[in-house]
Amino acid sequence: MSLSPQQQAVIEWAKQAQSGQLTTRALNLVARAGCGKTFTLMATTEVLEGEGFIGAYNRAIADEIKAKLISKGLDPRRVSAGTLHSAGMNAWRRIAKDVKVEREKVQIIIDALIADLVKKAQTAETAEKADRYRAKATTAKTLTGFVKKAVSLAKQRAFGFVHSFEDMSKWFELIEHFGLEDDLEFEVDMDEAVRLCIHIFKTSISQDRDLIDYDDMILAPLIHNARMWPKDFVLIDEAQDTNPARRALAIKMLKPKTGILIAVGDPAQAIYGFTGADSDAMDLIKEQLNSDTLPLNVTYRCPKAVVAVAQQWVPDITAHESAPEGIV
């Protein structure tokens, strides 16, 4: 299959960026649905020199990309593919060799806190102190679901790396942005709730060498500054669905000054905001890295009639000249 003019432009950009001919080493590739994104990624990987990593959104896509890399004859020791979680986990295991993955890590921490407060209430010197401990235990138990959501989102937002995790204003912003307060079925002291979140978050970080959860796989290498094996290039697939922690880890993987980052995605398909992703993730990448932008907007998947309807929402998508007319 020959390269289209748009795909060839991506290849030329990669060559020029790696040879130092451009003022930036980052590219936002805006790839609309059915426009040959994966084919372009593979072709770009073939011309880039040195060691690289392709970051897939999930394991299934990572396995698909790995198979295509092998079919292209690319050495997996030179160009690897995986999720950013797997990349973070590999880096973290070099620091914490015996670390265990525990999905319910935060729940375990909350349960331990409640048990400790109950014990203190039972052994308190005065009835007043006992009541205070019992009240704190009740609050922690009541807010368990809220705290678990908030702490998970805070990890995905890279609290403790992009800013202090003890900054209460950032927690209030997170709570408002994701509508977490709406999940509460009763009135609570939000200052107290945030202080509880901070305590649980801090405790979780302190246990990272022994126990990590899914969110920690990315946050731990960032917050503890784990050494990454530096790459000459990193390609991020589905970049429109990245959160601050994923983006920070991808950047951390690059060789300083010479590493190239290509963020591939479709802002029109940014649908994972509820998981901590930014709806404007690609704009944020461009702002942070001063990225160039190139399009992949000629779709090979859809008939012209379907594309005409889709243009109501994505005006720049175009049907390939060989596409059938189709019926909507």
What is the role of each PLM region?
Residues 1-12, 16, 21-30, 40, ...:
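Accessory N-terminal region flanking or inserted into the helicase ATPase core
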Residues 29-41, 47, 57-64, 85, ...:
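Conserved helicase motor core of SF1/SF2 NTP-dependent helicases
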Residues 88-153, 159:
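A basic- and aromatic-enriched beta-loop-alpha substructure that forms the phosphate/nucleotide-
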